[in-house]
Protein backbone atom coordinates (compact mmCIF):
# COMPACT_ATOMS: atom_id res chain seq x y z
CA UNK A 1 0.00 0.00 0.00
CA UNK A 2 1.42 3.37 -1.02
CA UNK A 3 1.83 6.37 1.26
CA UNK A 4 -0.90 8.15 -0.69
CA UNK A 5 -3.41 5.33 -0.21
CA UNK A 6 -2.64 5.22 3.52
CA UNK A 7 -3.30 8.95 3.71
CA UNK A 8 -6.61 8.58 1.87
CA UNK A 9 -7.60 5.72 4.16
CA UNK A 10 -6.88 7.85 7.20
CA UNK A 11 -9.05 10.76 6.14
CA UNK A 12 -11.87 8.62 4.75
CA UNK A 13 -12.15 6.48 7.88
CA UNK A 14 -11.94 9.61 10.03
CA UNK A 15 -14.84 11.23 8.17
CA UNK A 16 -16.89 8.04 8.36
CA UNK A 17 -16.33 7.88 12.12
CA UNK A 18 -16.73 11.61 12.83
CA UNK A 19 -19.99 11.95 10.91
CA UNK A 20 -21.33 8.40 11.45
CA UNK A 21 -21.65 7.78 7.73
CA UNK A 22 -21.84 3.98 7.69
CA UNK A 23 -23.65 1.36 9.76
CA UNK A 24 -23.05 -2.38 9.89
CA UNK A 25 -24.98 -4.17 7.18
CA UNK A 26 -25.64 -1.07 5.07
CA UNK A 27 -26.53 -1.66 1.43
CA UNK A 28 -24.67 1.17 -0.27
CA UNK A 29 -24.44 2.48 -3.80
CA UNK A 30 -21.20 4.16 -4.84
CA UNK A 31 -21.65 6.49 -7.79
CA UNK A 32 -18.73 5.99 -10.17
CA UNK A 33 -18.59 8.78 -12.74
CA UNK A 34 -15.41 7.55 -14.37
CA UNK A 35 -13.36 10.41 -12.90
CA UNK A 36 -10.34 10.28 -10.60
CA UNK A 37 -12.30 11.12 -7.43
CA UNK A 38 -14.87 8.34 -7.56
CA UNK A 39 -12.25 5.84 -8.74
CA UNK A 40 -10.04 6.74 -5.78
CA UNK A 41 -12.92 6.42 -3.33
CA UNK A 42 -13.95 3.06 -4.79
CA UNK A 43 -10.43 1.63 -4.55
CA UNK A 44 -9.99 2.72 -0.93
CA UNK A 45 -13.47 1.73 0.23
CA UNK A 46 -13.23 -1.66 -1.48
CA UNK A 47 -9.94 -2.26 0.35
CA UNK A 48 -11.52 -1.31 3.67
CA UNK A 49 -14.34 -3.78 3.04
CA UNK A 50 -11.86 -6.49 2.05
CA UNK A 51 -9.88 -6.13 5.27
CA UNK A 52 -13.11 -6.19 7.33
CA UNK A 53 -12.94 -2.56 8.49
CA UNK A 54 -16.54 -2.17 7.29
CA UNK A 55 -19.27 -4.78 7.02
CA UNK A 56 -21.36 -3.31 4.20
CA UNK A 57 -22.85 -4.47 0.90
CA UNK A 58 -21.22 -2.35 -1.83
CA UNK A 59 -22.78 -1.83 -5.27
CA UNK A 60 -21.27 0.44 -7.92
CA UNK A 61 -23.52 2.54 -10.17
CA UNK A 62 -22.40 4.35 -13.32
CA UNK A 63 -24.68 6.46 -15.49
CA UNK A 64 -23.92 6.41 -19.21
CA UNK A 65 -25.43 9.71 -20.37
CA UNK A 66 -24.99 8.86 -24.07
CA UNK A 67 -22.30 11.47 -24.61
CA UNK A 68 -20.42 11.26 -27.92
CA UNK A 69 -17.19 9.33 -27.51
CA UNK A 70 -18.24 7.57 -24.29
CA UNK A 71 -16.38 4.27 -24.01
CA UNK A 72 -16.79 2.28 -20.82
CA UNK A 73 -15.01 -0.89 -21.95
CA UNK A 74 -11.96 -0.27 -19.75
CA UNK A 75 -14.17 0.77 -16.85
CA UNK A 76 -16.08 -2.52 -17.12
CA UNK A 77 -12.82 -4.46 -17.19
CA UNK A 78 -11.57 -2.60 -14.11
CA UNK A 79 -14.77 -3.37 -12.18
CA UNK A 80 -14.74 -7.01 -13.29
CA UNK A 81 -11.12 -7.37 -12.16
CA UNK A 82 -11.93 -5.68 -8.85
CA UNK A 83 -14.77 -8.13 -8.34
CA UNK A 84 -17.47 -5.69 -7.26
CA UNK A 85 -21.19 -5.70 -7.98
CA UNK A 86 -21.98 -2.99 -10.53
CA UNK A 87 -24.39 -1.71 -13.15
CA UNK A 88 -23.81 0.77 -15.97
CA UNK A 89 -27.19 2.26 -16.83
CA UNK A 90 -27.73 4.11 -20.12
CA UNK A 91 -29.98 7.17 -20.17
CA UNK A 92 -29.87 9.75 -22.96
CA UNK A 93 -29.59 12.81 -20.73
CA UNK A 94 -27.06 14.22 -23.20
CA UNK A 95 -29.82 14.59 -25.79
CA UNK A 96 -32.03 16.41 -23.29
CA UNK A 97 -29.21 18.80 -22.37
CA UNK A 98 -28.37 19.65 -25.98
CA UNK A 99 -32.06 20.23 -26.70
CA UNK A 100 -32.78 22.39 -23.66
CA UNK A 101 -29.63 24.46 -23.11
CA UNK A 102 -29.17 27.46 -25.46
CA UNK A 103 -25.92 27.69 -27.39
CA UNK A 104 -23.22 29.43 -25.38
CA UNK A 105 -24.72 28.52 -22.00
CA UNK A 106 -23.10 26.01 -19.64
CA UNK A 107 -24.51 22.52 -19.33
CA UNK A 108 -23.46 21.77 -15.75
CA UNK A 109 -26.62 22.78 -13.87
CA UNK A 110 -29.08 20.78 -15.98
CA UNK A 111 -26.63 17.90 -16.38
CA UNK A 112 -26.24 17.70 -12.61
CA UNK A 113 -30.01 17.72 -12.00
CA UNK A 114 -30.66 14.99 -14.55
CA UNK A 115 -27.83 12.85 -13.22
CA UNK A 116 -28.99 13.33 -9.61
CA UNK A 117 -32.56 12.41 -10.55
CA UNK A 118 -31.43 9.13 -12.09
CA UNK A 119 -29.19 8.34 -9.12
CA UNK A 120 -32.03 8.91 -6.63
CA UNK A 121 -34.48 6.88 -8.73
CA UNK A 122 -32.08 3.95 -9.04
CA UNK A 123 -31.29 3.98 -5.32
CA UNK A 124 -35.00 3.85 -4.43
CA UNK A 125 -35.73 1.12 -6.97
CA UNK A 126 -32.93 -1.04 -5.54
CA UNK A 127 -33.64 -0.20 -1.89
CA UNK A 128 -30.21 1.24 -1.15
CA UNK A 129 -29.60 2.40 2.41
CA UNK A 130 -27.11 5.05 1.32
CA UNK A 131 -25.77 6.76 -1.78
CA UNK A 132 -22.01 7.42 -1.75
CA UNK A 133 -20.66 10.43 -3.65
CA UNK A 134 -17.01 11.25 -4.35
CA UNK A 135 -16.87 14.96 -3.49
CA UNK A 136 -13.65 15.96 -1.71
CA UNK A 137 -12.45 18.78 0.53
CA UNK A 138 -11.75 21.17 -2.32
CA UNK A 139 -15.27 20.66 -3.70
CA UNK A 140 -16.74 21.69 -0.34
CA UNK A 141 -14.57 24.79 -0.13
CA UNK A 142 -15.40 25.89 -3.66
CA UNK A 143 -19.11 25.20 -3.20
CA UNK A 144 -19.27 27.37 -0.08
CA UNK A 145 -17.72 30.34 -1.87
CA UNK A 146 -19.85 29.79 -4.97
CA UNK A 147 -23.01 29.80 -2.84
CA UNK A 148 -21.96 33.04 -1.16
CA UNK A 149 -20.77 34.82 -4.30
CA UNK A 150 -23.37 33.68 -6.83
CA UNK A 151 -26.46 32.65 -4.80
CA UNK A 152 -26.33 34.79 -1.67
CA UNK A 153 -26.51 31.72 0.57
CA UNK A 154 -24.23 30.14 3.15
CA UNK A 155 -24.25 26.46 2.25
CA UNK A 156 -21.98 23.76 0.89
CA UNK A 157 -21.88 19.97 0.59
CA UNK A 158 -22.62 18.24 3.92
CA UNK A 159 -20.98 14.91 4.80
CA UNK A 160 -24.44 13.38 5.21
CA UNK A 161 -27.96 14.46 4.35
CA UNK A 162 -31.42 13.05 3.71
CA UNK A 163 -33.21 14.12 0.53
CA UNK A 164 -36.31 16.31 0.84
CA UNK A 165 -38.66 13.41 0.16
CA UNK A 166 -36.97 11.40 2.91
CA UNK A 167 -36.31 8.53 0.50
CA UNK A 168 -32.53 8.69 0.12
CA UNK A 169 -29.53 9.23 2.40
CA UNK A 170 -26.45 10.68 0.70
CA UNK A 171 -22.97 10.47 2.22
CA UNK A 172 -19.60 11.96 1.25
CA UNK A 173 -16.72 10.04 2.89
CA UNK A 174 -14.03 12.21 1.26
CA UNK A 175 -14.93 15.59 2.80
CA UNK A 176 -11.49 15.69 4.49
CA UNK A 177 -9.51 14.50 1.46
CA UNK A 178 -7.48 16.96 -0.62
CA UNK A 179 -7.79 16.85 -4.40
CA UNK A 180 -4.02 16.78 -4.86
CA UNK A 181 -3.86 13.41 -3.07
CA UNK A 182 -6.55 12.00 -5.37
CA UNK A 183 -4.60 13.23 -8.39
CA UNK A 184 -1.48 11.48 -7.11
CA UNK A 185 -3.42 8.30 -6.30
CA UNK A 186 -4.94 8.21 -9.80
CA UNK A 187 -1.42 8.37 -11.27
CA UNK A 188 -0.21 5.57 -9.00
CA UNK A 189 -3.18 3.32 -9.78
CA UNK A 190 -3.52 4.23 -13.47
CA UNK A 191 -7.31 4.32 -13.27
CA UNK A 192 -9.16 4.02 -16.64
CA UNK A 193 -10.53 7.56 -16.35
CA UNK A 194 -13.31 8.62 -18.72
CA UNK A 195 -13.18 12.39 -19.38
CA UNK A 196 -16.37 14.43 -19.46
CA UNK A 197 -16.69 15.83 -22.97
CA UNK A 198 -19.43 18.21 -21.84
CA UNK A 199 -17.99 20.20 -18.94
CA UNK A 200 -14.42 19.74 -20.12
CA UNK A 201 -15.21 21.76 -23.22
CA UNK A 202 -16.60 24.76 -21.35
CA UNK A 203 -13.83 26.97 -20.02
CA UNK A 204 -15.65 29.86 -18.35
CA UNK A 205 -17.26 27.96 -15.51
CA UNK A 206 -17.89 29.63 -12.18
CA UNK A 207 -16.26 26.78 -10.28
CA UNK A 208 -13.02 27.23 -12.20
CA UNK A 209 -12.99 30.93 -11.37
CA UNK A 210 -13.57 30.25 -7.68
CA UNK A 211 -10.91 27.55 -7.68
CA UNK A 212 -8.42 30.01 -9.15
CA UNK A 213 -9.41 32.62 -6.55
CA UNK A 214 -8.72 30.18 -3.70
CA UNK A 215 -5.39 29.17 -5.24
CA UNK A 216 -4.34 32.82 -5.52
CA UNK A 217 -5.30 33.53 -1.90
CA UNK A 218 -3.42 30.42 -0.77
CA UNK A 219 -0.24 31.78 -2.33
CA UNK A 220 -0.38 34.62 0.20
CA UNK A 221 -1.66 32.48 3.06
CA UNK A 222 -1.45 28.66 2.71
CA UNK A 223 -4.02 28.25 5.50
CA UNK A 224 -6.83 29.82 3.45
CA UNK A 225 -8.28 26.52 2.11
CA UNK A 226 -8.28 24.82 5.52
CA UNK A 227 -9.68 27.96 7.15
CA UNK A 228 -12.59 27.98 4.70
CA UNK A 229 -13.22 24.28 5.39
CA UNK A 230 -13.03 24.78 9.16
CA UNK A 231 -15.58 27.59 8.94
CA UNK A 232 -18.19 25.00 7.96
CA UNK A 233 -17.89 23.39 11.39
CA UNK A 234 -17.31 26.61 13.33
CA UNK A 235 -20.53 28.56 12.77
CA UNK A 236 -21.51 31.48 15.01
CA UNK A 237 -25.27 31.98 14.42
CA UNK A 238 -25.38 35.06 16.67
CA UNK A 239 -22.99 36.80 14.27
CA UNK A 240 -25.15 36.28 11.19
CA UNK A 241 -28.26 38.04 9.86
CA UNK A 242 -30.72 35.17 9.46
CA UNK A 243 -33.86 36.31 11.31
CA UNK A 244 -35.01 32.76 12.01
CA UNK A 245 -31.66 31.90 13.56
CA UNK A 246 -31.58 35.06 15.65
CA UNK A 247 -35.16 34.55 16.84
CA UNK A 248 -34.40 30.96 17.83
CA UNK A 249 -31.46 32.18 19.90
CA UNK A 250 -33.68 34.66 21.74
CA UNK A 251 -36.44 32.13 22.49
Curated annotation (Swiss-Prot):
Annotated catalysed reactions: cytidine(32) in tRNA + S-sulfanyl-L-cysteinyl-[cysteine desulfurase] + AH2 + ATP = 2-thiocytidine(32) in tRNA + L-cysteinyl-[cysteine desulfurase] + A + AMP + diphosphate + H(+)
Cofactor: record remark: Binds 1 [4Fe-4S] cluster per subunit. The cluster is chelated by three Cys residues, the fourth Fe has a free coordination site that may bind a sulfur atom transferred from the persulfide of IscS.
GO biological process terms held by the UniProt record: tRNA thio-modification
EC assignment: 2.8.1.-
Location(s), subcellular: Cytoplasm
Keyword DNA-binding belongs to the record: no
Pathway of action: tRNA modification
Class in the EC hierarchy, top level: transferase
Keyword Chaperone: no
Keywords: 4Fe-4S, ATP-binding, Cytoplasm, Iron, Iron-sulfur, Magnesium, Metal-binding, Nucleotide-binding, RNA-binding, Transferase, tRNA processing, tRNA-binding
GO cellular component, one term: cytoplasm
Amino-acid positions noted as binding [4Fe-4S] cluster in the UniProt annotation, renumbered to this chain: 108, 111, 199
Required cofactor(s): Mg(2+); [4Fe-4S] cluster
Motif (PP-loop motif): 33-38
Gene3D superfamilies: HUPs
An annotated Gene Ontology molecular function: tRNA binding
Quaternary structure, from the entry: Homodimer.
Additional facts recorded: The thiolation reaction likely consists of two steps: a first activation step by ATP to form an adenylated intermediate of the target base of tRNA, and a second nucleophilic substitution step of the sulfur (S) atom supplied by the hydrosulfide attached to the Fe-S cluster.
Family of the protein in this entry: Belongs to the TtcA family.
Protein name: tRNA-cytidine(32) 2-sulfurtransferase 2
Native organism: Francisella tularensis subsp. tularensis (strain SCHU S4 / Schu 4)
Gene that encodes it: ttcA2
Amino acid sequence: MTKTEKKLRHYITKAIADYKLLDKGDKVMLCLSGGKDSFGLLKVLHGLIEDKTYDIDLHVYTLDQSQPGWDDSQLRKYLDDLGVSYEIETKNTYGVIIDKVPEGKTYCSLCSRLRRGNIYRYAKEHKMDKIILGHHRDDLIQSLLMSILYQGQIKSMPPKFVTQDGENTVIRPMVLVQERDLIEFAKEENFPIIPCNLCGSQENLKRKKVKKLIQDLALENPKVPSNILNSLSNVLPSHLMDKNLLNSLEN
